[in-house]
Amino acid sequence: MFALLSHKLLSRNMQNAKHFVLVHGSCLGAWCWYKLVALLRHAGHRVTALDLGGSGIHSNQIHEVTSIWDYVQPLMEFLGSIPEDEKVILVGHSYGGLPISLAMEMFPQKISVAVFVTAYLPHYTFPPGVLIQEFLKRTSAESLLDCQFTFGQNNPENQLTSVLFGSQYMAAKLYQHCKPEASFLTLPQIKS
């Protein structure tokens, strides 16, 4: 009886199951979603957490990502590969708002909803470059601790081309409220 009831509940959950596509923010990777992936899968949903170009375990190194299109390519390829009649729920965190916005424009028929989790929402008066420039103007160098910034590679305007969060910055600014083991898990995942 219990097995039959469990099967019926699972079947009902599978009928209502959604496909979530999780997009990380700057300097992170698919790994940062590990707790949410487990919760969503436990609830019967399909989950895809992607590493964007030069992030996480993606095969490209950060210096090989020379444009926003290099960065978002894994997301675009994934969305291009799903069946035309399938719709996903896109979830972007922080700078992940930009890739999901681009995906919404390129694949509107494949996206049921997009969720911006404290994420960048593009606007024509505030392109990403302006947002980053304003952040750097208003932020003291000391508060950035051991972050690394690369400027001017492959662009004549000497714009910011890459950011790498340092371990001190992550411990003090990103994971200060987490258990020590959670921040320890992130360190090997940050690319240099």
Annotate each predicted stretch with a short phrase.
Residues 1-19, 65, 81-84, 141-156:
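Eukaryotic N-terminal low-complexity, Ser/Thr- and Lys/Arg-rich leader segments
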Residues 12-60, 77-81, 85-86:
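Conserved HGGG/HGGXW glycine-rich cap/lid loop of the alpha/beta-hydrolase fold
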Residues 22-26, 93-94, 119:
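Glycine-rich His-Gly loop
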Residues 46-48, 52-89, 102-110, 126-137:
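Active-site loop/oxyanion-hole signature of alpha/beta-hydrolase fold enzymes
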Residues 91-96, 100:
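Gly/Ala-rich beta-loop-alpha elbow adjacent to hydrolase catalytic centers
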Residues 105, 109-158, 167:
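Flexible "cap/lid" loop of the alpha/beta hydrolase fold
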Residues 156-192:
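Conserved alpha/beta-hydrolase catalytic His-Asp/Glu region
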